[in-house]
């Protein structure tokens, strides 16, 4: 039992001796992105941002929606921490994996089949049967373009043209 405690204390001491005293944190207050270090922050590449405190220990990288990104160094000597920040705020993105793609293809096929079935049902069959008499038409003679109107004297305006002779 004592050997396991001694071994665990030895492992803990070995790990703690490797800890770097510089701490580089990424803070996200509200909709902003900020870097905080216990020593100075140096920009290697990317979004520069603005110093929040005058001692260069806190840097405001801007809003998350503006996709801040870059590489930053905490410290100035050989024992330094480098942090790469990369934000990607995608408002209109859809993750297209195999399940989503298969679902889109299957729903497209189902919609096409239903549309074809609907067109077949409505346009493929006649709505009713007509009698044979309705298929034949009373045809006029070849010389006649228009069928003459019948004589009627039952309306108010039928007597207006009594003085003029009608061609019969």
UniProtKB/Swiss-Prot annotation:
<keyword id="KW-1133">Transmembrane helix</keyword>
<dbReference type="GO" id="GO:0007166">
    <property type="term" value="P:cell surface receptor signaling pathway"/>
</dbReference>
<feature type="glycosylation site" description="N-linked (GlcNAc...) asparagine">
    <location>
        <position position="38"/>
    </location>
</feature>
<dbReference type="InterPro" id="IPR036179">
    <property type="entry name" value="Ig-like_dom_sf"/>
</dbReference>
<protein>
    <recommendedName>
        <fullName>T-cell surface glycoprotein CD3 delta chain</fullName>
    </recommendedName>
</protein>
<feature type="modified residue" description="Phosphotyrosine">
    <location>
        <position position="157"/>
    </location>
</feature>
<dbReference type="Pfam" id="PF16680">
    <property type="entry name" value="Ig_4"/>
</dbReference>
<keyword id="KW-0675">Receptor</keyword>
<dbReference type="Pfam" id="PF02189">
    <property type="entry name" value="ITAM"/>
</dbReference>
<feature type="topological domain" description="Cytoplasmic">
    <location>
        <begin position="124"/>
        <end position="168"/>
    </location>
</feature>
<feature type="transmembrane region" description="Helical">
    <location>
        <begin position="103"/>
        <end position="123"/>
    </location>
</feature>
<dbReference type="InterPro" id="IPR015484">
    <property type="entry name" value="CD3_esu/gsu/dsu"/>
</dbReference>
<feature type="glycosylation site" description="N-linked (GlcNAc...) asparagine">
    <location>
        <position position="56"/>
    </location>
</feature>
<dbReference type="GO" id="GO:0042105">
    <property type="term" value="C:alpha-beta T cell receptor complex"/>
</dbReference>
<keyword id="KW-1064">Adaptive immunity</keyword>
<keyword id="KW-0732">Signal</keyword>
<feature type="signal peptide">
    <location>
        <begin position="1"/>
        <end position="21"/>
    </location>
</feature>
<feature type="domain" description="ITAM">
    <location>
        <begin position="135"/>
        <end position="163"/>
    </location>
</feature>
<dbReference type="InterPro" id="IPR003110">
    <property type="entry name" value="Phos_immunorcpt_sig_ITAM"/>
</dbReference>
<keyword id="KW-0472">Membrane</keyword>
<dbReference type="GO" id="GO:0002250">
    <property type="term" value="P:adaptive immune response"/>
</dbReference>
<keyword id="KW-0812">Transmembrane</keyword>
<keyword id="KW-1003">Cell membrane</keyword>
<dbReference type="GO" id="GO:0045059">
    <property type="term" value="P:positive thymic T cell selection"/>
</dbReference>
<keyword id="KW-0391">Immunity</keyword>
<keyword id="KW-0597">Phosphoprotein</keyword>
<comment type="subunit">
    <text>The TCR-CD3 complex is composed of a CD3D/CD3E and a CD3G/CD3E heterodimers that preferentially associate with TCRalpha and TCRbeta, respectively, to form TCRalpha/CD3E/CD3G and TCRbeta/CD3G/CD3E trimers. In turn, the hexamer interacts with CD3Z homodimer to form the TCR-CD3 complex. Alternatively, TCRalpha and TCRbeta can be replaced by TCRgamma and TCRdelta. Interacts with coreceptors CD4 and CD8.</text>
</comment>
<feature type="disulfide bond">
    <location>
        <begin position="37"/>
        <end position="74"/>
    </location>
</feature>
<dbReference type="InterPro" id="IPR013783">
    <property type="entry name" value="Ig-like_fold"/>
</dbReference>
<keyword id="KW-0325">Glycoprotein</keyword>
<dbReference type="InterPro" id="IPR032052">
    <property type="entry name" value="Ig_4"/>
</dbReference>
<dbReference type="GO" id="GO:0004888">
    <property type="term" value="F:transmembrane signaling receptor activity"/>
</dbReference>
<dbReference type="GO" id="GO:0009897">
    <property type="term" value="C:external side of plasma membrane"/>
</dbReference>
<comment type="function">
    <text>Part of the TCR-CD3 complex present on T-lymphocyte cell surface that plays an essential role in adaptive immune response. When antigen presenting cells (APCs) activate T-cell receptor (TCR), TCR-mediated signals are transmitted across the cell membrane by the CD3 chains CD3D, CD3E, CD3G and CD3Z. All CD3 chains contain immunoreceptor tyrosine-based activation motifs (ITAMs) in their cytoplasmic domain. Upon TCR engagement, these motifs become phosphorylated by Src family protein tyrosine kinases LCK and FYN, resulting in the activation of downstream signaling pathways.</text>
</comment>
<keyword id="KW-1015">Disulfide bond</keyword>
<feature type="modified residue" description="Phosphotyrosine">
    <location>
        <position position="146"/>
    </location>
</feature>
<feature type="topological domain" description="Extracellular">
    <location>
        <begin position="22"/>
        <end position="102"/>
    </location>
</feature>
């Amino acid at each position: 039992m004592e050997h396991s405690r001694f071994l665990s204390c030895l492992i803990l001491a070995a790990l703690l001796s490797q800890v770097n005293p510089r701490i580089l944190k990424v803070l996200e207050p509200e909709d902003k992105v900020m870097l905080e270090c216990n020593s100075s922050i140096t920009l290697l590449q990317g979004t520069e941002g603005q110093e929040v405190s005058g001692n260069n220990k806190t840097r405001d990288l801007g809003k998350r929606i503006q996709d801040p990104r870059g590489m930053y160094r905490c410290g100035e000597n050989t024992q330094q921490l480098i942090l790469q920040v990369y934000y990607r705020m995608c408002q209109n993105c859809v993750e297209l994996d195999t399940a989503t793609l298969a679902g889109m293809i299957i729903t497209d096929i189902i919609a096409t089949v239903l549309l074809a079935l609907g067109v077949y049902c409505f346009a493929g069959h006649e709505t009713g049967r007509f009698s044979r008499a309705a298929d034949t038409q009373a045809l006029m003679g070849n010389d006649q373009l228009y069928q003459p109107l019948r004589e009627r004297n039952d309306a108010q305006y039928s007597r207006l043209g009594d003085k003029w002779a009608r061609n019969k």
